[in-house]
């Protein structure tokens, strides 16, 4: 369902200062398909063999998978952890973990990180890969990184030269074309009590991937999201629609809301619709973005057990989600850091994103407050939809370290998993259609 991208994509301007960059040289781009994969990942494994070479990803479903099913069995269900990290040994591994992960291990003795063998399962359609190779020498970032030009559907900058280009890779990465899922969002308070924040139905579309041979135009919608809330009772009947264009400078993102009590659809600021997941880069124009580099990290990966969990309540344990459901692996990530510009205001002074080299998904992020203290931390849970050649990052969650609370959003397992569907009609993507779907 790639929920991170859907809710995340309420993105405003990407006014990223000096991060704009020209295309890479043909000599550099020649590494794609040789030492690099076509999306820019290192094909080789790492020095000690804990990260294997890339061999094309996971394209064969387990024998227990039923063709056409939206619940995907875990292909690694029989594996055992190679390593368990907790507060007692966290200092040995802290350089390979996000700041949030380290803080949780130090704060809660019961918290643990179960590290399993690494599997580079990401697989994309060949046409998307071919487009990504072409983009390396053709795509351009404009307006200080705020917009892009001459991009075919795929990774726009497989060899990124800046923080802005890396973030565009994250935004425009392949996540399927049309997705329909039912989901829950849960809050867990400081006392460890879980409560249902919202239940809903999500339709997500990435229209730029409907025609893989057509370059983006400035006004082309690259992402659109339609949410209808079914619970709890106080939220039932509400709906939200978001649309984001390829050039947010000329065509800013738009959002609409339907409230059943008012019985009308109104346009709202897309900035007003924010969710605390790793992809939420609300007010990106307020930050200077830097591509820090690439790093080997222990991150949530191949989390089929969590993504397709049948009972959400088994996840929502006090202080942190149940470690029994979280699979961690060592992978290489791009580290991208955003620092608040002088004179700008935001609750986050600094943000640090960890982007998977094989998919460009944001696997995690750390957020810091105005005093420079770690404030919140977010995680997305990756699994490869092996029957569809789609890398997915569902669900996602955020820890509020200042309050000792957390939220997990996009829990789809209890509602049948992730469905890749035919597109909705054009008439269903207009604001006027929201009133009909939102009335109780």
Residue ranges: model-predicted function:
Residues 108-109, 290, 386-389, 399-401, ...:
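Short, intrinsically disordered/low-complexity patches at protein termini
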Residues 1-8:
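Bacterial N-terminal signal peptides that target proteins for export
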Residues 26-252:
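Solvent-exposed N-terminal domain segments of exported/luminal and surface proteins
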Residues 416-440:
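Long, C-terminal catalytic modules of enzymes
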Residues 9-14:
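Hydrophobic helical h-region of N-terminal Sec-dependent signal peptides
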Residues 23-24, 29-57, 98, 226-286, ...:
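Gly/Pro-enriched, hydrophobic low-complexity segments
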